[in-house]
Amino acid sequence: IYQFSDNFMTLFRTELENYLVEQGFSKDNITIVDGANDQATQTGQIDNFISEGVDVLIVNPVNSSSAATITDKVVAADIPLVYINREPDAEEEQRWEDNGWNVTYVGCDARQSGTFQGEMIVDLGLDTVDLNGDGKIQYVMVEGDPENVDAQYRTEYSVKALTDAGLEVECLSDQVGNWQQDQAQQIVANALGQYGDKVEVVFCNNDAMALGALQAIQSAGRTVGTD
């Protein structure tokens, strides 16, 4: 797991372990380690697992861009590899298919997630969202991690849903919150302090950052969906 302190991944690893036990795996044969949000640490952990001769590796990469390096190590050891939650890029996935490797990715479609975010704004209608009446939707974007493919897709497709619907948009601020609630809270608080009532929409790449944004909005005396 890329980082144990991530609330979502805490739930994920708990459910994953429970499911494996339900399927008949011995808990003693399941080892889950904390990558501590450091790719070098995680790569070392993977090297250790390979040396120990594990039967399968499930990897939630710290950096999706490191997938090729991880894949090469694991494939060379002839160990099945499953990536979860953080999707490697399309070129890397195509490499698995071209070579017939026992490697796959399991996770949600981040393009769809981003589109759903944007469509929620579209469904509200311009009259509701365009609080300052200038005919544009001004937004603040809080990204999880610019190197993470899921973050890239959610960022791109949330805004694309607005422009595809014919809405004019203006990005007031695009900052990295590293998936963390406290960082997102500070980013949104700063944006509200700088842009005030001009901020009409806040997009966040995950739930934790959305909660941080909510706290900042409430602290600024504004109400989500109203002002």
Name each model-derived stretch.
Residues 1-227:
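A residue-level marker of the well-folded mature domains of exported/periplasmic proteins
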